[in-house]
Amino acid sequence: MATTAAGRLFSLELLVDWVRLETGLSPCAASPAVAFRLLDFPPLLVFPPAAPGPEPQRGAISFGRGKACLLRLHPAALRRPRLRAALLQLPVGPTSAPGLVGACDILLVPSLGQRGVFALRGPEAERVGELALFYRLTELGRFSPGVPQLRGPLSPACILDSEALEVSEPRTEETSKPCTKGISARCLQCVSNARLLEGSEPCAKDTNSWSAGDSDASVVQKSWEEAVLHSKASSGDMASAPCSPAPSGKTVSSVSQDVTELDFETNTFCPPPLYYTHLTQEKTPSARVEITIEPQRNEPEDLDDIFPETKLVSPPLRPVKHTRAAVQESPPVLPNLPQTQGPGEANEAPCPPQIEQSPVNAIRQLPLLNALLIELSLLCNQPVASPTQVHPHLAWLYRGEDKGPDPSTKSTSPSESKSNKLSVRENEKLVNPQSKKNPKGKHPKIGGSPPPKVTKGRLLYGLTNTLRLRLQQTNPNMLVVHEKREQYRRSQIQAVGPKLRIPSWKGKVSSSAAESQMSPQLPADTPTDSNGKLPSLAVQSQLPPQLPGDESLDSIGSFEEGSDTSMQIRAGFDESSTTKEVKQSHAMKQEMVDQSENRTIVTALRAPVSPAGSVTPERSLRSNSFGGNWKNKVPSPGLSLQEPTVDKTVDEGKDGRQVKAISAADTSENRPTSRKSSCESISELLYRDGFTSPCYSEDFCTTENNSRSLPAPDSSTGVEHVQKGSRASKSSEARLSTRKNSSDSSSVLTPPFSAGSPVCSHKRSRALKIHDSLEEASSLSTSDFSSQWTNEKENQADPGSSKVMRKGRDSSTKLKVRAGHKSSEKSQSPRTSQVSSYEPSNLSELELKAIDDSDLADFQEEEDGLGSLRISRQCKDICELVINKLPGYTV
């Protein structure tokens, strides 16, 4: 049945359970064997076990063994798939031929398997015994085209020669050849210990049917000898060995190697090595190794770069590496380990280099994880060398690393440079407030390197980092202006020199009071003082006679306080003006010193000489308001610029409470200046005087200031000190101390900007208006005075006067605020009066704005030499609006 046509693969499984002979026949003296022959394939021999098992039946020989082989059959061969099974009696000697005991034919049909007992018939067709056999013929599909075609009958099936999974004896050379010959055969080894077996013997090729009637001994012996040659050597049961017919044994041996390789490749089950941590390199597919090695070729250099840095800088990455080591430790990585191990890595951790290196390789092959680690290293300012593989979407993470020489500084270099510049400026400006707050000879250090730390932990609302950064982005020009102000403030601090420390609220009050008092009396005492401020102060001091003596003194004190207050307001809006009045004596003394020190400021004020009457009346009004209820407001044209707040009428203090109403003229004046000079003056003062959030917030919202402002009016002694001339020194000292103290005491206070919120101010103004209508009337009168004072100021048009007026406005504003802070009623009443005065005096205020804008701009340009500082006028204008329009707030 040889054919070259492509056949189909079949699996034949045979299991002999037992063989029983008839009673008349004695068991085979020699070892019995069952031979199966199918078509022209070599016979399959099944031998009983060496140690016979229990007999299933009386007189039965227990086998319990079988064979299994793969066959390639042409479809035509399936027309009569008969299996011949024969019971043979093996000869005792090697020379004697085996004897045939009985045989039977079994019809093979591809099926799931059948079990049956078949009758064995002897040569004469007599019944000689029974064969219990299980057989199964399974079609496996078309034969693989890759299997080489063999010469001759290519359909001989493998003869499985050994039993049970063990081969007790080595195979002979003859046996080995047929075994390798099983080209297409795959040994599906049958379970050996199955008890139910069936057997069959293939029909001899020469005889179409090998029936019991065939008594040709030669044929039987021939096929039997062939079977013995293949299987006698093996006493095992199930070891499979492909066998070929004797005629083609040599030809098959030439192809045996190819078949063996095919068997190994196709029959080897290799589970994915990914699921196993301890795989040997031999089991790793070559393709897999190549894929893994590709990305790792350039890694050793990178690893050397990465790990020294990571090792030294970011130890947290080590546990990550160790945890990944077990996962990544795989044969693909092992070949590269000796190369990839970096010098720094060996010292990095006790882990062996393989364990250490494998996680690195794993990370490199995981772009997202690698990017995450690099991003973390960047956040820690510890950049890692650029990895070999960078995900295209993550390339931006690695750009900054290659730029700088030092990986730790690469990521932060741009931001640090900016922040360093800002911090240097900021520190310098922070030093200025400190020097003012710490006047004890510390100001000389301002020009030096920034202080290592801010000692008192104050919030210095100078040019803060936040403000600097914000201005840098939004308004660079304004940033330049602020920096100039910082420099100017620094120079003023140096000029002021050491100053006396006063309690925060006392210092603030005294500084403001001293400034307000000192401004009028200094001119009186020292009208020819080198400071340009003195003439205007003299004019202002001349005004007090117009008012009652007490009033004039109070007004002078309030005026000096207003001038100092204006500086304080610029510095930080120290305590309420009344508090300043209470401590006018100290402030006046300080202001005397300050005048000598701050000659530049005084000189700027000195040039303009305004009618003393207008300025003094307002100050006297303030002092009188402290002493009693005053509705009279005297405009101070001479001090108009410096004392817009002084011009603001001091509303009648209800129940002896000082009610300070900032005149609408002052408000309007402050407003025109506000857009240019008001911002400049306020910002200058704030930055220049070491403005601190506490002081600023105190002026706006501190209740302490209110309580302090109550005693503040009792500053008649302050007025006297102003007359003595020590007011200047005290006022300057009080300013500095007030700034420091106010910052300390009012550190809890709300920020200045929040205090100036229009909503809250409107609410307060309404409540204050409702609370005190009399104060509103007084404020109206004050607004009239302020308008008159504005007209006088216009006539004067003196830049020094404008500066003095700004100071006066600031001081008066502070006085108002303090009076309002002393008591809610007081605060309400002055604020209400401020609002009322502001409303009626809108025209005058507008005029004042125009005048103040021109005068203050000129004055600040002369005094500070900073024409760009006119922006402070805007701030001033806003402050004026807040103070006057919104009585609840003071600037």
Swiss-Prot record:
InterPro entries this protein is in?
Answer: MAP10, MAP10_C-term
Q: Where is this region: Disordered?
A: 325-355, 401-457, 504-679, 702-844
Main localization category: cytoplasm
Q: Which organism is it from?
A: Mus musculus
| Keyword check for Metal-binding | no
Lineage, top-rank taxon, reads Eukaryota
Q: Name the UniProt key words of this record, in alphabetical order.
A: Cell cycle, Cell division, Cytoplasm, Cytoskeleton
SUBUNIT field: Interacts (via middle region) with microtubules.
Instruction: State its location(s).
Output: Cytoplasm, Cytoskeleton; Cytoplasm, Cytoskeleton, Spindle pole; Cytoplasm, Cytoskeleton, Microtubule organizing center, Centrosome; Midbody
Q: Which Pfam families match?
A: HPHLAWLY, MAP10_N
Ranges annotated as biased composition (Basic and acidic residues):
577-592, 645-658
**Function description:** Microtubule-associated protein (MAP) that plays a role in the regulation of cell division; promotes microtubule stability and participates in the organization of the spindle midzone and normal progress of cytokinesis.
Q: Could you tell me where the Polar residues compositional bias lies?
A: 509-520, 527-544, 665-679, 702-718, 726-749, 776-790, 826-844
Q: Name one GO molecular function term.
A: microtubule binding
List this protein's GO terms for biological process: cell division; cytoplasmic microtubule organization; mitotic spindle midzone assembly; positive regulation of cytokinesis; regulation of microtubule-based process
Name assigned to this protein: Microtubule-associated protein 10
- Return the GO cellular component terms, semicolon-separated: centrosome; cytoplasmic microtubule; midbody; mitotic spindle midzone; mitotic spindle pole
Q: Where is the composition biased (Low complexity)?
A: 407-417
